[in-house]
Amino acid sequence: MATIHFTKVHGSQNDFFLVDEEENQIMDWSDAKRADFAIKLCDREHSLGGADGILYVTKSNEAGPIGQMRVVNSDGSIASMCGNGLRTVARYLLEKHALTEAKVETMKAILDVKKATSLGFDIPTYQVEISPVKFNAESLPMNVGVEKLFNQVVPELDSELAFSAVSVPNPHLITFVDQTVLDSDKQETLASYLNSENPYFPDGVNVSFVKRLSDDAIYVRTFERGVGFTNACGTAMSACSLIKKMLDKDTFETPLNVYNDGGRVQVTAKKDEAGEISLQLIGNATFVSTGSVSYERGTVTELTNEATPEQAQYQELVKEVKQFLKTTE
């Protein structure tokens, strides 16, 4: 029997179990083991309440980063990137190494992370880089008859909605809608189709519907590939912010407030001299509890689980966000 220690975390209530492989060397962490463990532990019927996925933290393969993040979704599939998860990994590693900023390796890039000024209620807040940003069809991959999809109607997907597609580096399909469309079943129907066998996004895609709230604020709801609807998706909020800035020809460096069912984050963008775009995602990194489970013959059993006071703290922000969103309906 293997005893696995974890930290239950969330970014914008996009929740995960964080497992430090260096602290859990009793397990042979193969890709198959990571997937099976994620499927079992992330089951919402599990005594620990499940999660959207597991963040596996291990040593980096490179000299500079202080660690590496691997993301496995609740269905066992691998996510190339997770912005909400990266904020919690950033906090975990920075606290572990007594640093305020560093680099963390992900599956597609080495990214800057740092401790940031709290967004409110003394909630632990971290800033993480989201990149690389690509628009070409191959990066998603996408087959809708164009090399770059930006604010265009795709009749095969919907006869009225205008879509944009971007990888950051996981793929996102984005459309701006009004409250009537948000209240309909369009998003679930479209996203479910595009995340099953289909000719347009063969690897699936994260689908976000975005509502404008003001010049400096948007609301984002995302159907995540491999998960379904979540309280928030960090890379989706980043991607939607970029598309909004491009549509409105906004100043990239100006922070955009992004509201979601899990709270609020801020996103800024920048373009370097070579024209390469990178995004900065700023939001909470909440540690909900610490505990342990046994993992034996494919069965995951709760052993310990001790809550922290941080979730109650975060709920104050959620309450404020919900009150604000009611005024925008």
From Swiss-Prot:
One GO biological process term: lysine biosynthetic process via diaminopimelate
E.C. no: 5.1.1.7
Cellular component GO terms, alphabetical: cytosol
Residue numbers marked as site, Could be important to modulate the pK values of the two catalytic cysteine residues: H172, E224
Keywords: Amino-acid biosynthesis, Cytoplasm, Isomerase, Lysine biosynthesis
Annotated positions binding substrate: N14, N73, G83, N84, N170, N206, E224, R225, G234, T235
TM segment ranges: none
PROSITE patterns: DAP_EPIMERASE
Top EC class of this enzyme: isomerase
Catalytic residues in the record: C82, C233
Catalytic activity: (2S,6S)-2,6-diaminopimelate = meso-2,6-diaminopimelate
InterPro entries for the chain: DAP_epimerase_AS (IPR018510), DAP_epimerase_DapF (IPR001653)
Compartments, record wording: Cytoplasm
Any GO MF annotation of the entry: diaminopimelate epimerase activity
Listed pathway(s): Amino-acid biosynthesis; L-lysine biosynthesis via DAP pathway; DL-2,6-diaminopimelate from LL-2,6-diaminopimelate: step 1/1
Keyword Transport: no
Family as reported in the entry's similarity comment: Belongs to the diaminopimelate epimerase family.
PANTHER family for the chain: DIAMINOPIMELATE EPIMERASE (PTHR31689:SF0), DIAMINOPIMELATE EPIMERASE, CHLOROPLASTIC (PTHR31689)
Function: Catalyzes the stereoinversion of LL-2,6-diaminopimelate (L,L-DAP) to meso-diaminopimelate (meso-DAP), a precursor of L-lysine and an essential component of the bacterial peptidoglycan.
Quaternary organization: Homodimer.
Official protein name in the record: Diaminopimelate epimerase
Organism of origin: Listeria innocua serovar 6a (strain ATCC BAA-680 / CLIP 11262)
